[in-house]
Amino acid sequence: MSDERDERTGLFILNTGNGKGKTTAALGVLMRAYGRDMKVIMLQFIKRRGSRLGEHLAAEKMGVEIVPLGDGFTWRSDDIEKDRQLARKCWETCQDKILNSDYDLVILDELTYALTYRWLSVDEVLTTIALRPRWMHVVVTGRDAVPALVEAADIVTEMLEIRHSFKKGIPGQIGIEF
């Protein structure tokens, strides 16, 4: 693994936009990296601790780390200060995994929301990503990525919603949405 790391240039990848597929695309990268014997982790900002969604069930079967750190917090919260503090705590965990671990791939799922709502410092996040080991890939997902994040990323993909079954009244489907 060290020889491969010596030859690797870590990428900063951003999946953003209002369409479906940001987390799903990041999970695809996770699968490819894991298949190449890379050490991988996905840290989820909004999904609740103890979540048992499809990706958590699959990760458990495979022995892959997908760690929900949130409590479902959103901008519609009853206690914004509590959510800000939780986002900060989530970020500290992410920062530790980026700076003090030997992961080859770190995915920060739904991080963009914490930046959009100014719960975290964009400069601090970008500095941490810049200070990662040179061989580490970082993927960030979420809607409404702030311009500085878009500018800093090596690869930016914007998911565009053209049509979604929700608008037809079809509820989220097991294995597709969760």
Residues of each region from the PLM?
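Generic detector of well-ordered alpha-helical packing
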Residues: 45, 110-111
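Glycine-rich phosphate-binding loops of nucleotide-dependent enzymes
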Residues: 107
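Extreme N-terminal, non-catalytic leader segments
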Residues: 1-11
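Conserved P-loop
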Residues: 11-99
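Short glycine- and Lys/Arg-enriched binding-loop motifs that mark or flank ligand-binding interfaces
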Residues: 6, 15-17, 24, 138, ...
